[in-house]
Amino acid sequence: MPDPAAHLPFFYGSISRAEAEEHLKLAGMADGLFLLRQCLRSLGGYVLSLVHDVRFHHFPIERQLNGTYAIAGGKAHCGPAELCEFYSRDPDGLPCNLRKPCNRPSGLEPQPGVFDCLRDAMVRDYVRQTWKLEGEALEQAIISQAPQVEKLIATTAHERMPWYHSSLTREEAERKLYSGAQTDGKFLLRPRKEQGTYALSLIYGKTVYHYLISQDKAGKYCIPEGTKFDTLWQLVEYLKLKADGLIYCLKEACPNSSASNASGAAAPTLPAHPSTLTHPQRRIDTLNSDGYTPEPARITSPDKPRPMPMDTSVYESPYSDPEELKDKKLFLKRDNLLIADIELGCGNFGSVRQGVYRMRKKQIDVAIKVLKQGTEKADTEEMMREAQIMHQLDNPYIVRLIGVCQAEALMLVMEMAGGGPLHKFLVGKREEIPVSNVAELLHQVSMGMKYLEEKNFVHRDLAARNVLLVNRHYAKISDFGLSKALGADDSYYTARSAGKWPLKWYAPECINFRKFSSRSDVWSYGVTMWEALSYGQKPYKKMKGPEVMAFIEQGKRMECPPECPPELYALMSDCWIYKWEDRPDFLTVEQRMRACYYSLASKVEGPPGSTQKAEAACA
């Protein structure tokens, strides 16, 4: 997941205060000259380095608990770019407003931080180990949940560092530091037997010094009376630049031979999944024989952890178990199906009922589409076509068909997605559901549609009503009644005649020439985006089909929904390009939607936090 400031030309990444000042000197030291850099103290925070009266000023920008960004005592902003734009108009307590960005020289990329270099491998390890996923299921999980997983693993990144020794006594630490070259500044970090505390051991002048590192009630790490940090690795990086109470700066790591490094492979202890985390407490009964606890405590929020798609029973196919796969057939035995007296929905075809399907090793909740008695033969054939199509599809973001049961009626047995359709879920929840959550769900839909595109399927009925929720953070595409499988060499399907089509979701070529392709699904995706970002409003409100067609032919498009981020409306507009061949494909749509979602996930909306303004010394 890229840094939210990575696209800013005046963002330098993980550079020191001295390096920032050198860049500002080279740029001329004009009043209002500024740059942005990563903050070593605050996870996800920044430092604004500013010139005024030929002096340097450094202001830490902290990421608030609600995901906004603020200089201490100042207004909160949804992202670093928005914060800098605000201070370019109003100094609001700074010595002067931001007047001239000190842009990076041509060819110079932002300097990656320590965690940046480890993040991708740690995310992959965490997802693989926590949910036991492999292959495509693993890749889909990494893409869809990277913002959430990154927040979990940042606190354990120190376990991948060469200077971290997970089980070392004070005496053993001294022996290690005295062995070999006794270079001033040689150091290591180890856990102490008191839960949640650590010791930093440092050699200087042939003597080893030990410094206590503890956590405060907010979970921040510090040496007593020293600067506080969100993580241990940030504290170490800071102390490499500034002694800050130590006898000497940290210079050279005393390596742990079993730690993961550039050439090693030992994995860190990954954080427990949020649902298993507890508040820290001193576990005297779990001390090892040498007095050390096996795993440092982690301070966590008392709030209920947010669910991830991988936590649900419908992320992987019920047939992902090789034993269950042996019984996979299109037609199911009625004896294995229990139909509850609970109706989930109804329509012209019949009803959808809740049920349970008994498999070889487990029972699963299912939704059962029951065709009503006396149904026309054509409707029965259409339902069987839908079943044939759905049975071929296997993706976490598509409702899977378990099978068909022919008994008292024709029944399609599908995965349960009990949260209901997306548009109904969002109605009236603008204040409750942030745009970042909506973008998360839309990104999942784009992943499902990219899968269909790769499989050469055209959905033909993509709309918010056909996006079902498993929970607030997990969406699946449903209703494949109009879907078609294209031939290997075909790029579109031509319908023989027009039916009861959802014209407000259809691209011009569908209405005018009955031509359907993955690019016409892209048009429908744009309308689905509009529905979701309008929080369940109806598209083309009060217009009828012919009026919608005329509206589109005149080059008009629906307006940007209120408070919809411009980058999302830009994607929406590209989905509505008139010529189908000029529209993006779902590969491109998913990539752009992913970038929007990641950006919004890193700057969650919320009420401004309140802090006290003060210029602070920071690295």
From Swiss-Prot:
Q: How is it modified after translation?
A: Phosphorylated on tyrosine residues upon T-cell antigen receptor (TCR) stimulation. Phosphorylation of Tyr-315 and Tyr-319 are essential for ZAP70 positive function on T-lymphocyte activation whereas Tyr-292 has a negative regulatory role. Within the C-terminal kinase domain, Tyr-492 and Tyr-493 are phosphorylated after TCR induction, Tyr-492 playing a negative regulatory role and Tyr-493 a positive. Tyr-493 is dephosphorylated by PTN22.
| Modulation of this protein's activity | Activated by phosphorylation at Tyr-493 in the activation loop. Inhibited by staurosporine.
Where expressed (tissues)? Expressed in T- and natural killer cells. Also present in early thymocytes and pro/pre B-cells.
Which GO molecular function annotations are given, in alphabetical order?
A: ATP binding; non-membrane spanning protein tyrosine kinase activity; phosphotyrosine residue binding; protein tyrosine kinase activity
Listed under GO biological process in this entry are: adaptive immune response; B cell activation; beta selection; calcium-mediated signaling; immune response; intracellular signal transduction; negative thymic T cell selection; peptidyl-tyrosine phosphorylation
Ranges for domain Protein kinase: 338-600
Location(s), subcellular? Cytoplasm; Cell membrane
- Coiled coil spans: none
**What Enzyme Commission number(s) apply to this enzyme?**
2.7.10.2
Positions of the region Disordered?
A: 260-309
Instruction: Identify which top EC class this enzyme belongs to.
Output: transferase
Cross-link Glycyl lysine isopeptide (Lys-Gly) (interchain with G-Cter in ubiquitin), where in sequence: K544
Annotated PROSITE patterns: PROTEIN_KINASE_ATP, PROTEIN_KINASE_DOM, PROTEIN_KINASE_TYR, SH2
Q: Which disease is it linked to?
A: Immunodeficiency 48: A form of severe immunodeficiency characterized by a selective absence of CD8+ T-cells. Autoimmune disease, multisystem, infantile-onset, 2: An autosomal recessive, autoimmune disorder characterized by systemic manifestations including blistering skin disease, uncontrollable bullous pemphigoid, inflammatory colitis, autoimmune hypothyroidism, proteinuria and nephrotic syndrome.
Query: What protein name applies here?
Result: Tyrosine-protein kinase ZAP-70
- Species this chain originates from: Homo sapiens (Human)
